[in-house]
Regions:
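Bacterial N-terminal signal peptides that target proteins for export
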Residues: 1-11
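Bacterial N-terminal signal peptides
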Residues: 10-19
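Basic/polar N-terminal segments that are highly enriched at the extreme N-terminus
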Residues: 1-2, 20-24
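Phosphate-end processing signature that detects enzymes handling 5′-triphosphorylated RNA
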Residues: 23-280
Length: 280
């Protein structure tokens, strides 16, 4: 396989460097707001309750309806990011993440591995097609726009990043694996045979994350399923950040999603200026 990569390398690097003339339409948009950590200071359940109340108020003011989840559909996962010592992935706008479900207080032996090409500018159609063709047959693919609100603490200010990603479930711990091992799963990554032995290790301490669905906002033509992510250090002692988000497919309900997003940004008592989780 590495011999084939060596022959194709110049074309591959050129393909990832140059953007296509036409931009690809995103499969989905994810709206994100960073929640003030003090909202979850007493407990996550109390934080969920406070956010539900805020969502109900915002929905009511916009002529929408909020339906809170009956139970907190909460899942605990260990999150880990990888790169080489010289940040070979980050230099080419890639990130590699693995999530391990927590069972009986311990991370599973295998987790979901996600490779992501992420930029502040839109990706071209040809670039997206190459990304899709270079993924493993069983991987789950998506092209998404991430919209972060309250940039610099100002309501209405937002930052958008575009990402093409593919994930594979039930993968063994990737710590100590190499770029060559990664290329076995994702063959069209833009690395040469000489890079194959570069070792992948965690880029930061692991994170213990609690992910929950807390309800949904409904309006004519669509709905927004509200999700939270609360991140702690690996021991679960220090709260690092919290986030409220929802995803939707671009279409007729775009204006409703934007109106809800703008309304929530007025709650500076609940939401804070911050950064995307992956940039921690």
């Amino acid at each position: 396989m590495l011999e084939l990569k060596r022959v194709a390398l110049p074309a591959i690097i050129m393909a990832w460097t140059l953007c296509g003339a036409a931009f690809a339409a995103t499969d989905s948009v994810e709206m994100k707001l960073q929640v003030r950590k003090e909202i979850f200071a007493s407990s996550r359940q109390e934080g969920y309750k406070i956010l539900r109340s805020a969502l109900e108020d915002a929905a009511l003011n916009l002529g929408m309806k909020f339906h809170g989840a009956d139970d907190d559909d909460e899942e605990a996962v260990m999150v880990r990011y990888y790169d080489t010592a010289d940040q070979a992935l980050a230099e080419k706008d890639f990130s590699l993440r693995q999530k391990f479900k927590i069972k009986d207080g311990r991370p599973s032996d295998k987790g979901t591995l996600t490779i992501k090409l992420r930029r502040r500018t839109e990706l071209g159609k040809e670039e997206i097609e190459r990304f899709q063709k270079g993924m493993a047959p069983k991987s789950e693919y998506k092209y998404e726009a991430d919209v972060l609100g309250l940039v610099n603490g100002t309501a209405g200010n937002r930052s958008t990043a575009y990402s093409a990603s593919a994930k594979l479930k039930k993968q063994p711990d990737f710590t100590g694996k190499t770029l060559g091992d990664l290329a076995e799963l994702f063959p069209l990554l833009p690395f040469s045979a000489s890079d194959a032995s570069a070792v992948l290790n965690p880029t930061a301490p692991d994170v213990l994350a609690y992910e929950a669905d807390i309800g949904e906002v409904k309006f004519p033509g669509g709905e927004a399923e509200m999700e939270t992510a609360v991140w702690y250090d690996a021991e679960g002692k220090t709260l690092e950040l919290a986030e409220l988000s929802w995803k939707y497919k671009p279409g007729k309900s775009d204006e409703s999603h934007r109106a809800l997003f703008e309304a929530l940004q007025q709650r500076s008592d609940l939401f804070d200026a911050g950064k995307l989780k992956s940039s921690r």
